[in-house]
Design a protein with these regions (language model features):
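Membrane-interface alpha-helices at helix entry/exit sites of multi-pass transporters
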Residues: 41-50, 72-73, 163-175
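Juxtamembrane transmembrane-helix boundary motif
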Residues: 1-16, 21, 33-44, 60-142, ...
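Generic transmembrane alpha-helix signature in multi-pass membrane proteins
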Residues: 31, 60-66, 154-159, 184-194
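Interfacial segments of multi-pass membrane proteins
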Residues: 31-42, 155-168
């Protein structure tokens, strides 16, 4: 990427990291949507970078919260997530050869749906979800992670409906994101798709991810949750709509 494109990419990384650190998800969607809408890079490239920096974000955020992880939910989510992440990545490889515009439209749909989930205020279930529904949710998140490196929306919506403490929910989500992004990155590396440009862009992004994640702990108490959610919702809707409508008006 050129200098201007790299700066824009890093700006999207900073915005996405701040939102993710406060709300629990949306970093990958903001980066993927912004990069794709602005034409900064191909989907496969952006998704690979997002996976690497999301992995770092999860590691940094889990330093003080890993004790809160609900291991039963985490295990069941991962059981569905890992195989479907691989399936989504394989599907991305197939579709990238001749279905690029379709991938962008599908990304737009995913982003808009995620925006809707972000604004939804689901009432917690009366009891914890069972093993099957947890694995199914992990599978859905894994498929989107494999395709776009950003499958947090269904996982976050599902976990925030559980009758659990919010610290447990956030830590469990972060631990799940860590597995999904690490697994995706490992598969990309083994399959020979990890280029030097992907690594360089990720290395430039990682300091921003670390600094913004640490700063967000001080900023979060002063940011109204509803205001932030509305801002992110509007941003996601605009990004998603631009990706869906672009082929129509070309």
């Amino acid at each position: 990427m050129a200098v201007t494109e790299t700066i824009l990419f890093l700006l999207l990384v900073a915005i996405g990291t701040l939102v993710q650190s406060i709300t629990g998800f949306a970093m990958g969607l903001i980066i993927m949507g912004g990069v794709t809408a602005l034409g900064l890079a191909e989907i496969a490239f952006s998704a690979a970078v997002v996976s690497l920096i999301s992995m770092v974000n999860a590691v940094v955020a889990l330093r003080h919260t890993y004790r809160y992880v609900d291991r039963i939910f985490w295990r069941n989510l991962v059981m569905g997530l890992v195989p479907f992440t691989i399936a989504g990545l394989a599907l991305l490889h197939i579709l990238s050869t001749g279905f690029t515009e379709g991938l962008k439209v599908l990304l737009g749909i995913v982003i808009i749906l995620a925006g809707g989930l972000l604004m939804a205020q689901p009432h917690p279930f009366g009891h914890s979800s069972g093993r099957f529904s947890t694995i199914a949710t992990g599978s859905a998140g894994g498929l989107v992670t494999g395709l776009y490196g950003a499958g947090g929306a269904p996982l976050a919506w599902f976990m925030y409906r559980q009758p659990l403490d919010v610290n447990v929910i956030r830590a469990t989500l972060l631990a799940t994101f860590l597995v999904s992004t690490a697994g995706r990155s490992a598969f990309v590396t083994v399959s020979g798709q990890l280029t030097s440009e992907i690594v360089l862009t990720a290395l430039l992004s990682i300091p921003i991810v670390v600094v913004v994640t640490l700063m967000s702990r001080r900023i979060a108490p002063f940011v109204p949750d509803k205001l932030l959610r509305r801002f992110v919702f509007l941003l996601l809707i605009l990004l998603g709509a631009s990706l869906i409508l672009r082929p129509i008006y070309r």
